[in-house]
């Protein structure tokens, strides 16, 4: 079941009614029953996979709690659980990419998301940050909460479980806020992403015939499509959760306003970045290898470089894995390595950048100049990364980049696949999305202010947003065929 479908809206409405009608003490079980129904509607194989994985994680966590004084046993349980679930995930994704899955077997929707969430819980139990849960049903609900499991955001036990475990009263303000967020997500997905994606696909397929300016525009359009698609899906998910009284964390925070690569990744797919920093990057930096690398770096290059080297090396590892997470092909690896190299270089060269920044900002207008330079540098790096993301081979990616420098051109082209009307709608919709992002950047509590605004203001804006989506949205057959780009992960 796609979250962009009338079936999902009907399912959510029915579950919300049942949830708020039932006595408070049993409402969490209504969420579990509703989530189980959602898994089955998405495919029984995925439901079986999720059940088996959470059983393993629950069992390992319980045993870690039982043998907490025996670190060797606990470490073996942690490693065994992680290797098993990550190994199964990698195998499923590899077989799917090779089109070698047995007949009738499908990759569970949101496989990576609920796997990362489950493993995070197991690591937190091992570290003593979370008490092992005795009730398996709660672990199952935590990993498989139905809106979230499709494409995140990835949460921790302490973030999510207290909310799922506590009954919620129907809040008019929360309800309005959730509906607005869902409507805004539908707008971004259906009006922007699904309108631009076919055009981007056609442009990429004919890239060798395009002038360089249009190749560059294609990369920019693809970045917009990814943002509108992924953040739109997250908005729908967070809004649906808010209707049930659950507050999921923000997963995108205006990434195209970032002034550095590090800032960009603090704004883009936030929960994935937090997961990798918490469970991989920080442990790598604090490991014996990280400490040893710092000592070697200090001896060879000085104290500042020595302190930066463990973080730089760990960032390379993290971004390489993020690239592989996107797929088992060279473009995904290059995508991760590109951001890893930029992040590592930023860490190692930070002392030099600080000196330059200090000199420039000492002059009038220097602060604004550095901000503008930082933004342009970051967006150029992000645009180059899109060539790896939107193509299927390094040759295609580098070929598109080459067109920018060898045949930039300045004239129009007959190859642009977006008509005048669709182009106008797309431009206006993107500008509206940009305006909302600017307002949110200046006022982070914009939705809260909207929720308490006069009734006629709320309803006018909400009905207008729904009307625009219904009129200008692009719908697949049955209103659910345009799958989210990140749901397959």
Task: For every predicted segment, state its role.
Residues 1-488:
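Membrane-embedded transmembrane alpha-helical bundles that form the catalytic cores
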